Amino acid sequence: MIAGMRRLTDRLFGRGEAASTIPPFDGPLKPNQALETAPVLLTLDTAEDLATDGSHVYAAAGQSVLRLDHDQPTEIHRFGGMVTALCCLPGGSLAVAVDGREVRILGGTHDGKHWTSVANRPLNAVNALAPTADGRGLLLTDGSREHPCERWCHDLMSGGRSGRAAQLDLHADSAREIANGLKYAFGICPAGAAIWISESWAHRVITCGDGGPLLEYLPVYPSRITPAAEGGFWLTAFTARTQLVEFVLQETAYRRRMMREIEPRFWIAPKLSASETFLEPMQGAHIKTMGILKPWAPPRSYGLVIRLTTDGLAAYSLHSRADGTHHGVVAAVECNRHLYVLAKGCGKILCLPVAALEQEFMT
């Protein structure tokens, strides 16, 4: 009742969830070119996720799981569907999500175990996996009940709030929901006794249990979270928010007509990569002059990795700005003191030395 009244007053006064204002990129989120100038390790057009066991980096690419040996990928598993999420488990096993609808365990003592539903509800858009803190279970986020992983933009434009997080017990073969009713859950990670979950359409990271915000009012749509070797975490964001998109999200009749009559690639909506077509909805001299996109223009796509402390505070960030190409960052893992970043928008895996990042941004 109280929440309903709050939403009503927010819409009346244009505040809270109904506000079209965007927090600035400031402080630890101050823009830079760290991602845009990062060395490219590999180009994988179908890459979807990254994982590491501390010694090797693995990539989900199309229907395959690849091990990255320097700049040479080696296929180690292949499936009959697209791999939408991936993580390494203790004991040398892997967990993969296939087509967002099935979670499988590969190798180790739990080899062959799989799940297709949680709490009597089929899995639909599994987009992130992580081991529990004790290593006996598996955490996952199921982004949406209505839309598969590849239709994430449809979920945003439809006002989706059917995401959930779940925990799978590898020993008891059981599964339970730990959070539901989320505005597109996309990222999960244990943090001590707590569990952190990215809630993309709410622009925040929450803690499981009380569902309280850990990091909120972000100017981006957060995605996967992974641990950093020296403590803390890496949080990725697959695109940035804009006032125009926030306005469109409030205009229900316009948005529904746009979705009904216009091709999705021309929607006024976030994207994973920059567009070069003359039909794109955002043009003009304040955005592009003589074919050159200005770096301060409202971004249709963006690339961002945020370094979080153990308390969930932003320490610094790595950017590929509006005029860059390393956009649509959906995964970042640290292995052997290097940060591997997947920019899905351009299909590239970047590699940055962590020591150099710490020296540049922490001193």
Locations of the language-model features?
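Sequence-structural signature of mature extracellular/luminal beta-sheet repeat domains
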Residues: 1-363
